Amino acid sequence: MKNSIKIFALLLLFSLNSNAQNNYQIKKATMFSEHAATQLELSDEDQKFIYETYIAKFMNDRENIFGKDLSKEERQAVYKASSKKLRQSMKVRFDQPTTAAIMKAVLELQKRNQ
């Protein structure tokens, strides 16, 4: 009985931690997509696409980095690869100038919030 309570408590802690990390990623993706859509006067559908693309990037980054004890250089390589993949995904829906403008708007927001 005590072991099952301990296991339940441990699982609860893990799920709360995971949920908090997911909430952070959702907040960040929402902020990025709203800012880019506002700056570039994009449609709601375009904003949703940007949001989903950033969520996929953040989840992929987390999956490839979290708990893997990577060096700083290895983490940077993961981030660089995921940023390249993000740009490629954006180019599926947007032309090159729009993609560049979205990335610039998000970068400006990141710098402003640091």
Predicted regions mapped to residue ranges:
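Bacterial Sec-dependent N-terminal signal peptides
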Residues: M1-Q25
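Charge-rich (acidic/polar
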Residues: Q21-Q114
